[in-house]
């Protein structure tokens, strides 16, 4: 088995799901791959994109939308309650018979998955588009 991860934006309450990018969910499955999850993360964090060679030339508003936010690469074995607010913990406990939440489970249940939006922006790049076209 092993631990599975998601990339979570605490401020926007959004996350990236590695499977959308044809990556595995274990840390080194997506951490060592190119044109996948970490490219999506770079696009979301990019501040000033589109001003030079090597940038993603797209007007997609998701580009840079995570710049400056608190981001966590969180595993499903993560510490309970860590990174969650008191209100988030209380809500979870109320809905789950007192069970302590972790951020991974909370994000899956309550945050927005922006993986497809990030992938659409990535596909504006011809090279990345060709990589995904070959994979299908």
List each language-model region with its residue ranges.
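Low-complexity intrinsically disordered segments
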Residues: 26-136
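Short, extreme N-terminal segment that most often corresponds to the first beta-strand
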Residues: 1-22
